[in-house]
A protein has these predicted regions:
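Hydrophobic membrane-insertion alpha-helices, especially the h-region
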Residues: 24-42
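Residue-level signature of transmembrane alpha-helical entry/exit and packing/kink sites
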Residues: 21-26, 194, 198
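Cytosolic-side transmembrane helix boundary signature
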Residues: 5-24
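A structural signal for short, hydrophobic/glycine-enriched beta-strand patches
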Residues: 3, 7-11, 41-200
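A transmembrane-helix-recognition feature enriched in membrane-embedded lipid enzymes
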Residues: 199-218
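Enrichment for repetitive, rod-forming helical segments
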Residues: 32, 94, 213-215
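Short linear elements at protein peripheries
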Residues: 63, 217-233
Length: 233
């Protein structure tokens, strides 16, 4: 009987130790691995693109076209989106400085009531940009879509991309992966209290970008026939 009790105790102890190891793996090593993977992807995206991002308009490279990445015009019915305003302001600065001759505004037009490219065009025209110097891409549902379509649909080999500073590395990373000679210029920063969640999401979005281009081979939502941009001023 004593022998049986000892055997049961040993068996129980082995199972308990196994459970402890499993719990330790789940609680510590798996989350640690995820954190390290997220960090590695972010370092890759940022580290491989920083040299292609201009410090200001003066140092920005001259290109025929600037790609302005879309966002919503408002964040609430009576509250303007500062990301929207600042991106267009920077695009206007590039245009007026002679750094670009044409603006490609790319964004979400998922419903008849939501049209980022049209909102961007209307705002830019009100800011003094000639309408003939603006092309709309109505299928820029994601950053990947906008970058790939700039290359494949609008037949651009080189482009200056305008968006928020935290967003630029991902845009440049995706564009250059698909053979687009991309340089970036950051719009003026939005106060962190109004953009904190967006900054946090970007850490995971960079991971998704790495997976999209190097593992999943994710295509844009919509393709189409080539529509080369004819630059005139």
């Amino acid at each position: 009987m004593t022998f049986l009790k000892k055997g049961l105790r040993l068996l129980f102890a082995k199972h308990l130790e196994g459970w402890r190891r499993a719990v330790f793996l789940v609680i510590v090593w798996i989350p640690l691995g995820v954190i390290m993977f997220v960090a590695a992807c972010n370092l890759w995206v940022i580290g491989s693109t920083h040299r292609f991002i201009a410090k200001d308009v003066k140092s920005a490279r001259v290109n025929q076209v600037a790609l302005v990445l879309g966002t919503s015009k408002k964040v609430a019915p009576k509250r303007a989106n500062l990301h929207f305003r600042n991106r267009l302001k920077k695009a206007k600065e590039l245009f007026n400085a002679g750094k670009v001759q044409h603006l490609l505004v790319s964004g979400d037009n998922g419903t008849r009531f939501y049209n980022e490219p049209q909102d961007m065009r209307d705002a830019l025209v009100n800011m003094g940009i000639p309408s003939h110097a603006i092309t709309r891409d109505f299928a820029g549902f994601r950053t990947l879509d906008s970058m790939v379509r700039a290359r494949e649909i609008f037949q651009l080999d080189s482009v200056s991309v305008v968006t928020d500073g935290f967003h630029l590395p991902r845009a440049v990373f995706i564009g250059r992966h698909f053979g687009l000679d991309v340089t970036g210029i950051a719009s003026d920063p939005v106060p962190l209290r109004q953009s904190f969640k967006t900054h946090l999401r970007e850490y995971l979005a960079r991971v998704k970008a790495v997976l999209d281009v190097h593992l999943l081979n994710t295509p844009p939502k919509f393709g189409g026939e080539p529509e080369p941009i004819m630059v005139s001023r």
